[in-house]
């Protein structure tokens, strides 16, 4: 399973010039030790808890190293989610009979982040990219999350590669960016 995940992430990183080194870091013959951080939290969980969570992770890794556990990472790969806005399929169906008149708004191709800290991480990263999931959700799924908006959302993956030596600085920057306790 780890090999499949490694292969998947290396494949997705190839589409990004800023993450071109990731496949070689993840290769079996590489001496690099890449720690994988999965970032997912409840929707109503405030962003201010992010900095203490990363600080606790850093402390636990340090304690593990003191216990001679194999947690000596050279890099961290942070997986998160992003999205783009897409035109609603429901609106297209409603407007289909009308050949003339109001045209539907085209969705902007801007990428938005589910987690605001992702933007702060970019300043300390070796590279980052968004990627399309290999297995896409149902086409109507973007309409299911639509509430009082003209556009739906299309989720995609987001990965950020950070050198372990810059991890502490990144945590401080996240704290400054989000506010809250450090």
Model-derived features with residue positions:
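Intrinsically disordered, low-complexity, positively biased terminal segments
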Residues: 1-182
């Amino acid at each position: 399973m780890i090999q499949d995940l490694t292969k998947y992430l290396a494949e997705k990183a190839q589409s990004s010039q800023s993450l071109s080194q990731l496949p070689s870091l993840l290769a079996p013959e590489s001496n690099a030790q890449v720690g994988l951080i999965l970032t997912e939290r409840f929707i109503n969980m405030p962003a201010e808890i992010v900095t203490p969570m990363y600080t606790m992770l850093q402390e636990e890794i340090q304690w593990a190293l003191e216990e001679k556990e194999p947690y000596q990472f050279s890099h961290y790969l942070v997986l998160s989610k992003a999205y783009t806005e897409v035109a609603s399929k429901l609106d297209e169906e409603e407007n289909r009979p009308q050949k003339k008149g109001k045209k539907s708004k085209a969705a902007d191709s801007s990428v938005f982040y589910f987690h605001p800290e992702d933007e702060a991480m970019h300043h300390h990263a070796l590279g980052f990219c968004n990627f399309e999931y290999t297995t896409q959700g149902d086409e109507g799924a973007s309409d299911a999350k639509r509430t009082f908006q003209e556009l739906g959302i299309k989720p995609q993956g987001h990965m950020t590669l950070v050198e372990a030596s810059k991890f502490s600085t990144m945590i401080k920057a996240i704290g400054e960016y989000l506010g809250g306790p450090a």
